[in-house]
């Protein structure tokens, strides 16, 4: 989201294009590490949140599932392509990442099961953890995507975060 405003300037600035390609490629790599994560390290360095009850990996800083974390990379890549005409970012890794995005969105519609994502944290802040043994509040599967956390990193009480679902379409 932070570099998105620069996209309109990229056509005239080679260094800016290179920076945007790097950001898109980094976001692609992050999605491939874990599409449910919202914060990543530069490498496998671990995190202060390693004790969270979820599938943490050393490359992750935090694993709070938000729909927006998968929408912003798509928006950036799409508008970069529309502005510059460069398709180099749409390689096989990008394709794999988009398959992971699609799979994650389908899993979090929770039509067949709760999906693989759970999260709980030992904390005195209710907004930092999910209810129901890490699954979040129950939902009736209607086709919307469950977002366990809001873009502000606080837990959703009602999993169908409508603005984020609109962003996803």
How would you label these PLM feature ranges?
Residues 46-64, 126-160:
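Acidic/His metal-coordination segments adjacent to aromatic residues that form catalytic metal sites
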């Amino acid at each position: 989201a932070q570099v998105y405003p620069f996209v309109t300037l990229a056509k005239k600035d080679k260094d800016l294009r290179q920076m945007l390609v790097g950001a898109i490629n980094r976001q692609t790599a992050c999605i491939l590490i874990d599409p449910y994560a919202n914060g990543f390290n530069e490498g496998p360095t671990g995190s202060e949140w390693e004790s969270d009850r979820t599938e943490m990996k050393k490359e992750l800083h935090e694993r709070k599932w938000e729909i927006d974390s998968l929408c912003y990379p798509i928006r950036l890549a799409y508008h970069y392509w529309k502005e510059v005409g460069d398709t180099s970012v749409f390689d096989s890794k990008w394709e794999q990442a988009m398959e992971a995005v699609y799979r994650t969105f389908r899993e979090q519609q929770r039509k067949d099961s709760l999906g693989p994502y759970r999260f709980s944290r030992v904390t005195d802040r209710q907004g930092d953890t999910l209810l129901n043994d890490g699954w979040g509040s129950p939902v009736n599967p209607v086709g919307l995507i469950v977002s366990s956390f809001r873009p502000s990193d606080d837990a959703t009480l009602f999993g169908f975060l409508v603005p984020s679902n609109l962003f996803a379409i």
